[in-house]
């Protein structure tokens, strides 16, 4: 009898436990599903934020591109104005030399005038000492014949005419001197006015360039902040994706546990019916035994790892002095014959027609000498080539960079003696002086040696 009671009690406990297990599993699954929905909602919001941030960055990049175009135009005008100032200062210097030459000529003219004045004074004094016009009359009356009289009259007339010519020539020299001085003063006034106008224009352009550069920096700061926020949003999206995947795995495990519990319940109910049937059909007092067993499942998780990537920068380009001279010779061969083209030199057609911008010109010149600096090179990539050297140690063949419309916005090949070979928007391919006010202001000591 006790065995029957025990069997019935055990079956009751197992049955009750199996009733509660699916309920508990269903509750847990509902909570997990709710968490998954919340994460999906949050991930949707983050993705929306990512899309919005991408549009913001695209807009900032478009504004930056337009601004760079405006800065390029201002920079071109500033360079042209600087070149005009340089030319006008040369003209001013030449005019000053003309002034010195004219002063010398003036002194010589004054000396001739003084000498002529002395001759006239001496002649007048001689006339006065010898009776003046009476002396001329005595000369005429002393003639021995009519022919002699004519000869003496002609001589007297010649002397008088000579004095008159001296006076006329002296007057002409004075007029010439005054005219030369007047022309010179007019020319100097025009030069000074033009120089003043050019310097005012240059100052205004520099001011505009500074304002645009500040605006460019502000846009760059905004873009950097937006990109940082975008990076954070992407990280958050990645984290939410992992959480969602973990919850999905948890849901699978909970559903598997619920299925196992339901199966256990079914097996328990079947066992209980079997025990009850055996007890009813046995009248001999024999007791049937029942035992149960439970299987526990195990779950395993796999960890995945992603390989890390290592990026390396370009190495120093090295060659020999022959490559430097070959590059300079090639570049110099088109001085004055190659117009500047923004973004040029990056197609075979441009190269064949010698249409470059500053960076593609430098790349082309060195490529012709067997030194490859990278097809499609820009000032941003070239400034990372070779190794940095100080401005005091730069030598022929080094790359020199200038802060024009942006930091390191222009590049050329240093030739030595303060000159460099470059392709600029004002003169195309040309040799320019680093002492030119424009280039002097733009050069901040950035020099790269690409050929040792």
UniProtKB/Swiss-Prot annotation:
EC supergroup of this enzyme: hydrolase
EC number, as in UniProt: 3.4.-.-
Keywords per UniProt: Cell wall biogenesis/degradation, Hydrolase, Protease, Secreted, Signal, Thiol protease
Composition skew (Basic and acidic residues), residue ranges: 39-53, 263-275
GO BP of this protein: cell wall organization; proteolysis
Listed transmembrane segments: none
Disordered, as annotated region: 28-53, 258-317
Domain of life of the organism encoding this protein: Bacteria
Any single Gene Ontology cellular-component annotation: extracellular region
Cellular compartment(s): Secreted
Protease among keywords: yes
Biased amino acid composition, Polar residues: 28-38
Pfam families: CC_PcsB, NLPC_P60
Function: Shows a cell wall hydrolytic DL-endopeptidase activity.
Protein name per Swiss-Prot or TrEMBL: Peptidoglycan DL-endopeptidase CwlO
């Amino acid at each position: 009898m006790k065995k029957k009671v025990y069997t019935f009690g055990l079956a009751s406990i197992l049955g009750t436990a199996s009733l509660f297990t699916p309920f508990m599993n269903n509750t847990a699954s509902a909570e997990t599903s709710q968490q998954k929905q919340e994460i999906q909602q949050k991930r949707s919001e983050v993705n929306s934020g990512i899309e919005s941030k991408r549009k913001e960055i695209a807009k900032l990049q478009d504004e930056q591109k337009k601004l760079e175009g405006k800065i390029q135009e201002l920079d071109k005008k500033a360079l042209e104005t600087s070149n005009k100032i340089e030319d006008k200062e040369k003209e001013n210097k030449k005019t000053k030399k003309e002034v010195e030459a004219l002063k010398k000529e003036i002194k010589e003219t004054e000396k001739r005038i003084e000498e002529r004045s002395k001759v006239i004074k001496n002649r007048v004094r001689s006339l006065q000492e010898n009776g003046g016009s009476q002396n001329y009359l005595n000369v005429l009356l002393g003639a021995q014949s009519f022919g002699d009289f004519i000869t003496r009259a002609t001589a007297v007339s010649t002397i008088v005419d000579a004095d008159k010519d001296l006076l006329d020539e002296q007057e002409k020299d004075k007029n010439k001197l005054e005219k030369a001085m007047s022309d010179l003063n007019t020319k100097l006034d025009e030069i000074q006015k033009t120089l003043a106008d050019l310097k005012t224009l240059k100052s205004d352009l520099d001011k505009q360039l500074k304002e645009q550069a500040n605006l460019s920096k502000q846009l760059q700061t905004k873009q950097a902040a937006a990109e940082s926020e975008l990076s954070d949003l992407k990280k958050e999206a990645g984290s939410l994706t992992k959480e969602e995947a973990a919850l999905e795995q948890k849901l699978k495990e909970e559903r598997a546990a619920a299925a196992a519990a339901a199966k256990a319940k079914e097996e328990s109910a079947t066992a209980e019916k079997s025990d009850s049937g055996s007890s009813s059909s046995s009248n001999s007092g024999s007791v049937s035994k029942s035992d149960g067993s439970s299987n526990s499942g195990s779950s395993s998780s796999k960890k995945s790892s992603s390989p890390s990537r290592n990026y390396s920068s370009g190495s120093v380009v090295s060659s020999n002095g022959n490559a430097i001279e070959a590059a300079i010779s090639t570049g110099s061969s088109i001085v004055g014959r190659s117009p500047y083209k923004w973004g040029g030199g990056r197609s075979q057609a441009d190269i064949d027609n010698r249409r470059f911008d500053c960076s593609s010109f430098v790349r082309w010149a060195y490529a012709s000498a067997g030194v490859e600096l990278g097809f499609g090179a820009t000032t941003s990539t070239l400034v990372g080539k070779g190794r940095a050297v100080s401005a005091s140690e730069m030598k022929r063949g080094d790359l020199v960079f200038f802060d024009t419309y942006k930091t390191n916005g222009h590049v050329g090949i240093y030739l030595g003696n303060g000159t460099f070979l470059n392709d600029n928007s004002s003169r195309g391919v040309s040799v320019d002086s680093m002492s030119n006010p424009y280039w002097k202001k733009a050069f901040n000591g950035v020099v790269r040696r690409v050929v040792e």
